[in-house]
A protein has these predicted regions:
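Conserved beta-strand
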Residues: 29-32, 40-53, 81
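ABC ATPase nucleotide-binding domain signature
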Residues: 108-112, 117, 147, 165
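Helix-to-loop junction immediately C-terminal to a conserved catalytic motif
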Residues: 73
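The feature captures the beta-strand-to-loop junction immediately N-terminal to the Walker
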Residues: 58-60
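ABC-family P-loop ATPase nucleotide-binding domain
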Residues: 1-33
């Protein structure tokens, strides 16, 4: 933990970031220049995140937080650099290929569910972007088994889960 506090108070450089995630790096972003259209937003951005490490992107509006995430998921133009998950380069993969290849997907900030479908049906909807939709049943079941709160509500309409979750 002490090395985390050493980088506070200054803009960390790549070597500082590597000390925060010395073991089993899961996400690597190296020398990333990315943006929208011809406008470059990120300049030589670097990030290293270990497995089981939490990360919080903090900064003012326009600092590039969303652009970092959009770049990981393939929603920006990548002018230079690379993005890797577990050592596999994903920079040029489409969002669907990223989901299939390394299991990452972009979930919108709002409650992006179908409220009149069950929790399980909402999970199954994600399977339609896969090549083999029959795999979606297995994947949904894994999620329902892993997260008791969802599993216990698998046949409940999602709108009721949202009401409970959001406290409405």
């Amino acid at each position: 933990m002490s090395n985390q506090y050493e980088v506070l108070g200054k803009a960390p450089v790549a070597e500082d970031l590597k000390t925060l995630s010395p073991n089993d790096v899961h996400l690597t972003i190296k020398n990333l220049n990315a943006g929208y259209g011809k406008m470059e937003i990120l300049h030589n951005f670097e990030l290293f995140v270990s497995k089981a490490q939490s990360l919080c992107l903090i900064g003012p509006n326009g600092a590039g937080k969303s652009t970092i995430l959009h770049s990981i998921y393939g929603f920006t133009n990548i002018f230079n650099g690379k993005i890797e998950i577990d050592g596999k380069e994903i920079t040029k993969l489409s969002p669907a290929e990223k989901l299939k290849s390394v299991g990452i997907a972009y979930i919108l900030q709002d409650n992006s569910v179908f409220p009149d479908m069950t929790v399980e049906e909402n999970l199954l909807m994600g399977g339609f972007i896969k090549d083999k939709t029959e795999d979606s049943f297995e994947e949904a079941e894994k999620i329902l088994q892993k997260y008791d709160r969802l599993g216990n509500r698998r046949n409940q309409l999602a709108k009721f889960y949202l009401v409970e979750k959001e406290g409405y």
